[in-house]
A protein has these predicted regions:
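Interdomain "pre-motor" coupling segment immediately N-terminal to P-loop NTPase/helicase cores
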Residues: 25-76
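Pre-Walker A (pre-P-loop) alpha-helix and adjacent loop at the N terminus of AAA/AAA+ ATPase modules
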Residues: 73, 77-123
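Short glycine-rich substrate-engagement loop in P-loop NTPases that contacts/grips substrate
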Residues: 89-103, 123, 145-185
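Conserved alpha-helical scaffold flanking the Walker A/P-loop in AAA+ ATPase domains
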Residues: 110-115, 162-190, 206-214, 240
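Walker A/P-loop nucleotide-binding motif
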Residues: 120-136
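P-loop NTPase Walker A phosphate-binding motif
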Residues: 135-148
Length: 268
């Protein structure tokens, strides 16, 4: 009976409060909290699962952190055009026209993306300058960012700059160094673009091996794009780096003409 009396008293006070609000020109629910998201009441979770509002904020944050927001508005699968890849000659290396080769590359990439959450793999995109390797990695990055995966996208120059700072910069706090390394080694996907453009020395080789090996051990996905041939990769780095990549990555050769040059000619 005490609880019934208490409920009745609360109901009475609530009605008095609403009456006072209405009396002074305010809506009856004026003092109730106003939520940005009515579904989760701004907690970010519904029944232990991330609310759609939280997922949206994560995507926005990841885009801002990846430095890719503006680029990905134009470089994504909806803007991918196979017409830039010739179909009037066959490449000796693949036995296919560049267009058919790219179709098969896209099939492999789509399969990679569909299984990413369950079985994250690794890709090596290699081929001549301007054949669309960076464009394709941007397409992949957008797909995964849109699904709230953490994506770190770096040119090889930037990657080794960061690793060098973490190793030798005394002005950089240990907290900042740890955060940077954690981001590089633990993100769902690390994209290393244009491997081979950095100054090569024993430091870059050892750091590259550590990065690749740690991510493999932690089952984190890595995508590398490069203009280097297999022989160049082996010679420039080391046999063990070459072995780690060729044994654990899906190797995708991209053929064709320089698309950037084609676009420049078309614009003029």
């Amino acid at each position: 009976t005490d609880s019934i009396d208490l409920d009745a008293e609360i109901d009475k006070i609530t009605k008095q409060k609403e009456a006072l609000l209405l009396q002074h020109g305010y809506p009856a629910d004026y003092l109730k909290p106003v939520y940005e998201c009515a579904d989760c009441k701004d907690t970010g979770y519904i029944d232990g699962r991330k609310c759609h509002c939280f997922e949206k904020l994560i995507v926005q944050y990841l885009y801002s952190q990846s430095n890719l927001k503006d680029v990905l508005e134009h470089e994504n699968f909806s803007h991918f055009n196979l017409d830039f890849y010739p179909d009037d000659y066959t490449e000796e290396a693949t036995g296919e026209t560049p267009r058919d080769n790219m179709r098969h590359v896209l099939e492999t990439v789509k399969s990679y993306l569909s299984g990413f959450s369950d079985t994250p793999g690794n890709l090596l995109l290699y081929g001549n300058t301007g054949v669309g390797k960076t464009f394709l990695t941007n397409c992949i990055a957008k797909e995964l960012l849109d699904k709230s995966h953490t994506v770190v996208y770096l040119t090889s120059l930037k990657l080794f700059d960061i690793l060098e700072s973490c190793k030798f910069d005394r002005d950089l706090s240990q907290t900042r160094k740890n955060a940077s390394l954690s981001y590089l080694l633990s993100s769902d996907l690390l994209i290393i673009d244009d491997l081979g453009t950095e100054l090569n020395n024993s430091f870059t080789s050892s750091q590259l091996y550590h990065c690749i090996d740690t991510r493999l051990t932690n089952h984190r996905s890595t995508i590398i794009s490069t203009n280097l041939s297999f022989d160049d990769l082996r010679e420039r780095y080391s046999e063990r780096i070459f072995s780690r990549i060729t044994s654990n990555y899906t190797l995708l050769k991209i053929t064709g003409d320089d698309i950037r040059l084609k676009k420049a000619i078309m614009q003029h």
